[in-house]
């Protein structure tokens, strides 16, 4: 089997050689970036963070994190519409990430728990889904919450 590879240009990483099978297709794009449909996940070494890099625009890359690493009790149900759209057949098909905003004052780093990125890892399809759940904020302050969890 021949695996097609592409060179993806990235402002963060320079040139990345990416297998076509690692490209994730977001049919609806990501809110505010609806015109961008193809992304690839790049792992940061020795870090809980990943990058969701646009294949189509080198300047667009989101820092993302697995929310279960920072909030082990994070849970939600996906509606059938999303399950069908992503062709999910089992929980093993799914990877969940949340977008991270890291401002100049790193202590103000926040995670969007309200709108996780759901990926079917086998079908390479993704969506950013807005949860109808008041438990999860748009701005979950990472360091503030980690410190309060450690004190418990």
From Swiss-Prot:
- Domain of life the protein comes from: Bacteria
The record's Gene Ontology biological-process terms are: bacterial-type flagellum assembly; regulation of translation
Q: Which Pfam families match?
A: FliW (PF02623)
Q: Name one GO cellular component term.
A: cytoplasm
List keywords of the entry alphabetically.
Bacterial flagellum biogenesis, Chaperone, Cytoplasm, Translation regulation
Which Gene3D superfamilies is this protein grouped with?
Answer: BH3618-like (2.30.290.10)
What are the subcellular locations of this protein? Answer: Cytoplasm
> Which HAMAP family would you find in this protein's record?
FliW
Family membership: Belongs to the FliW family.
Functional summary from the UniProt entry: Acts as an anti-CsrA protein, binds CsrA and prevents it from repressing translation of its target genes, one of which is flagellin. Binds to flagellin and participates in the assembly of the flagellum.
Outline the subunit composition. Answer: Interacts with translational regulator CsrA and flagellin(s).
Q: What is this protein called?
A: Flagellar assembly factor FliW
């Amino acid at each position: 089997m021949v695996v097609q590879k592409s060179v993806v240009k990235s402002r963060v990483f320079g040139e990345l050689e990416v297998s076509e099978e690692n490209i994730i297709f977001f049919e609806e794009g990501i809110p505010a970036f609806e015109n961008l449909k193809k992304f690839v996940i790049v792992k940061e070494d020795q870090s809980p963070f990943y990058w969701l890099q646009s294949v189509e625009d080198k300047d667009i890359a989101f820092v993302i994190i697995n929310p279960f690493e920072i909030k082990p009790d994070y849970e939600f149900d996906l509606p059938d519409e999303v399950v069908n759209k992503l062709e999910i057949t089992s929980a093993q098909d799914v990877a969940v990430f949340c977008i991270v905003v890291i401002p100049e004052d790193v202590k103000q780093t926040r995670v969007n728990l309200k709108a996780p990125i759901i990926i079917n890892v086998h079908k390479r399809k993704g969506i950013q889904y807005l949860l109808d759940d008041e438990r999860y904020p748009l701005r979950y302050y990472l360091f503030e919450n980690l410190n309060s969890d450690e004190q418990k």
